[in-house]
């Protein structure tokens, strides 16, 4: 109660009652005036606010609502079991114990229904799977996985697949499909003619032209690398045949020896200018190695 109501005392005089009524009316009028003034002041404050501050207030309210509605992660219920005594004279069990045992059984059924994955006994142990689980039609068989550098290919030729059980000998495959070089050369010639045709170039964009040039370059380099491998194969075959003419047991070269034989054959069949370039390149390489071994390079 307010201060005025505390000081009021009951009296028989009517003048006192009139004064009390006037006081009440004045108090109510002052209260209504204050409320009107507060509403007007709040409206004026809202008018002066900028859109940026209103937006910030809205985002803060949204964040608080999101925090309030965030899901709470419940911890898994762990049940503990106790040994029960079956003595007839033991009457110490209460109803609370019976209820606890009842709820423990329910929780056990719930965990069984959730089908938790059994943990391994050790990290080296094999993974245990249920025999009731259906086996998928497509499975990853060890030894037949596609390497990462070949996964980007859209199509795969089943003739060269490991699942056939045959060893992939690149020389045999190259002999079988060597006739494809003619088609590759024809494609290269056609692309070169198109890139030299001015009418055709005027009809296409700059991006399409660059793409065609890149394709032509890659086709040429691929064909040249195939031919270089064929040449190296022939060189090594001739060298091994000459070496094993009078030998009862056939001798095969190591990788390092094969590389030396191929380099020697290429150097012998080079022209004079090409030899000079190769010798100059080797000389610069040797000088660079010697320069790195100087004493001032080892200082810190």
Curated annotation (Swiss-Prot):
Q: According to the UniProt entry, which residues carry Phosphoserine? A: 14, 41-42
What Gene Ontology biological process does one annotation of this record name?
maturation of SSU-rRNA from tricistronic rRNA transcript (SSU-rRNA, 5.8S rRNA, LSU-rRNA)
Listed Acidic residues bias regions: 85-109
Q: Which UniProt keywords apply?
A: Coiled coil, Nucleus, Phosphoprotein, Ribonucleoprotein, Ribosome biogenesis, rRNA processing
Instruction: Pull one GO CC term from this UniProt entry.
Output: 90S preribosome
Query: What domain of life does the UniProt record list for this protein's source?
Result: Eukaryota
Predominantly, its location class is nucleus
Q: Where is this region: Disordered?
A: 60-146
Indicate the segments annotated as coiled coil, or none if absent: 203-248
Where in the cell? Answer: Nucleus, Nucleolus
The record's listing under Pfam families reads: RRP36
The answer to whether keyword Ribonucleoprotein applies is: yes
Q: How does it assemble?
A: Associates with 90S and pre-40S pre-ribosomal particles. Interacts with CKA1, CKA2, CKB1, CKB2, PWP2, UTP15, UTP17 and UTP22.
Q: Which family does it belong to?
A: Belongs to the RRP36 family.
Q: Relate the protein's function as given in its record.
A: Component of the 90S pre-ribosome involved in the maturation of rRNAs. Required for early cleavages of the pre-RNAs in the 40S ribosomal subunit maturation pathway.
Name assigned to this protein: rRNA biogenesis protein RRP36
